[in-house]
Design a protein with these regions (language model features):
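Sec-dependent N-terminal signal peptides
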Residues: 7-14
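Bacterial N-terminal signal peptides that target proteins for export
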Residues: 1-7
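N-terminal non-catalytic accessory region
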Residues: 21-148, 152-211, 382-425
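N-terminal signal peptide c-region/cleavage motif recognized by signal peptidases
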Residues: 17-19
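Helical cap/lid subdomain of alpha/beta-hydrolase-fold lipid enzymes
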Residues: 162-425
Length: 425
């Protein structure tokens, strides 16, 4: 066979292979969670939010064809509103606008809804200030994206869709383009992994959320840069990292710490709804087991005496969160952990035994879909305007599903499955 024919055949086969997903090849946009970070944070060590020392984004870009996969960076400890604003302008281009009414009501520390210098250039040929380039300036209804998010990123992308389509619930936000609404069709799908749609009981169980979050950020930094002393992501002077006054103040409703609690999530869900024009998908996971007298896969050194009514962390759960996942917080003076925490105070979200199973950070019950919003088990036929639940991954903790620290290749099949579904929509 002549070489030109061989090449033509090879190209034809490659084209068929690339199009094996069928319907679309829209960009996938990855959105990190609470205490998350972008690709530049640990560039020296090579540690990535998506994949640890492996690379989920890089894998997706070349798996079964060529695809555009965009990795975003938003505030590590910001509210979903603020993170949505950063996400919008980072993708589309322009300077971040948090909204005038929102900024005033949230008492943003700098008093500005358009902080200087927090910009992305949509046109590389017209960039006199040398701003970083926007990720996808063509973004609109004719050029939609697939949003894929982990943990608090799930709340962030839901907020973004709400603002895109319906605008700000406050009305005019000082002219910010994001808050005008009317952008239906810009998002083809939204997929969440281990997202606290109804909050996480970890927020209430640990008491001092700020102290624990700061400690967790330091542990993440140590894991990401072995032998070094890097600045933890939540403490780095990143854009939007501390938009509101008193970020750990329990009365600060414009903060991640509030929205991630069950009560804050309920308030968030009261205005952020499921769009009838978007495909929603969710994945749950857990890394705890019911207590037993002996012989289960839990960490018996951490919890030698167990009660079958409660959940305990598996031996292989990440050390980062294992002390908070079981019946008791270790160490503590009789404070229940996620595997044993309940509360039934009047006027608050009831947290009962159904919340005990968890992945070390988020309760499995909370990962399926926001309470009261449409949800169904995915049966191979996706439905718009409803959460299509893709199932629960047993034995995976909050960081396993990201491939941390060196489990990226074990996590790849999860993302391959998601991509296969999205590209067929």
């Amino acid at each position: 066979m002549p070489s030109c024919i061989k090449i033509s055949c090879a190209l034809a086969l490659l084209g068929a292979f690339q199009n094996s997903y069928a319907a679309n090849n829209y960009p996938i946009v990855l959105v990190h969670g609470f205490l998350g970070f972008g690709p530049e944070q640990y560039k020296e060590s090579g540690f990535k939010y998506w994949g640890g020392f492996d690379d989920i984004a890089g894998h997706l870009r070349s798996h079964r064809g060529r695809h555009q996969v965009l990795v975003t960076t938003v505030a590590a400890i910001g509210s979903s509103w603020d993170r949505s604003a950063e996400l919008y302008y980072q993708i589309k281009g322009g300077c971040v606008d948090y909204g005038s009414v929102h900024s005033a009501s949230a008492q943003h520390a700098d008093g500005e809804h358009r902080p200087p210098g927090q910009c992305w250039a949509a046109d590389p040929a017209n960039n006199p200030n040398n701003y970083p380039l926007a990720l996808y300036p063509a973004w609109d209804a004719a050029h939609p994206v697939h949003l894929v998010a982990h943990s608090q990123g799930g709340q962030t992308i839901r907020c973004l869709i709400e603002l895109l389509e319906n605008g700000s619930p406050h009305g005019d936000e000082g002219g910010g383009d994001l808050y005008a609404g009317g952008k239906s069709g810009w998002v083809a799908s939204a997929t969440t992994l281990a997202a606290p749609h109804d909050g996480t009981s970890l927020h209430d169980a640990i008491g001092n959320f700020g102290l624990v979050a700061t400690d967790l950020a330091s542990r993440i930094a140590a894991m990401a840069s072995p032998g070094a002393q890097p600045t933890p992501p939540a403490l780095a002077p990143a854009a939007g990292a501390s938009r509101a006054t008193g970020v750990w103040n329990t009365e600060n409703y414009d903060s991640a710490q509030y929205e991630m609690g069950p009560d804050g999530a309920k308030q968030f869900n009261s205005w952020v709804k499921t769009s009838p024009r978007v495909y929603y998908f969710s994945i749950a996971n857990y890394a705890t087991e019911p207590g037993a007298p002996c012989c289960n896969n839990t960490d018996r050194l951490l919890a030698p005496f167990q009660d079958a009514r409660f959940q305990y962390p598996r031996q292989d759960m990440a050390p980062l969160t294992k002390p908070y996942a079981g019946e008791w917080i270790i160490p503590s003076f009789g404070r229940h952990g996620m595997g044993g925490y309940t509360q039934s105070d009047p006027g608050r979200v009831v947290v009962d035994a159904g919340w005990f199973r968890n992945d070390g950070v988020v309760n499995t019950l909370s990962m399926r879909a926001p309470a009261g919003q449409p949800v169904r088990d995915y049966d191979g036929t996706p439905l718009r305007g409803s959460w299509n639940f893709l199932g629960t991954y047993a034995g995976l903790d909050h960081f396993d599903i990201l491939g941390w620290p060196r489990k990226g290749k074990l996590a790849y099949p999860i993302y391959d499955r998601i991509a296969a579904i999205l590209y067929r929509l």
